[in-house]
């Protein structure tokens, strides 16, 4: 997929691309949740997530290329790069977790994995809403802040789920391979929420600079 933004104002071009990245995160998160809730056609579903991850890489490439050809940016270029990078990190973590389910030949996701995937969708929803508001001006920009706070809360919830999951994992049996597989999956799912929190923190900094 290619973007047609040649005739967009420079302000709108960057906001459009960042919003597209957040929309893509939401799509990837929903695909992950579907994988965890309906664990069938796993190879096809993981492949779909990989395609969305590659599309996300294209968005980030477009942002980087646009920065090289734009003298004046609507917000600091360092903030644009940081935000784009953190958004890309969210997708990378989701894709990695999905790839693990295929590579490790997981028979069925656990309730902990399903719970974490639901939290990731909630984080993605908040990010998409926040990125859609980024182009607003003045005091309205501050409406992003409650969304950032909610992402931080969700990340804390994911930490708690991870702690419970790891505790259950190490008391449920002595199958070392099983433990190692699920340790990787749990940690990577939780990492997606960490990266969402990183993006929220960058957003918060942008809001405080420009509102």
Give residue spans per PLM region.
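Cytosolic, long alpha-helical scaffolding segments
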Residues: 1-211
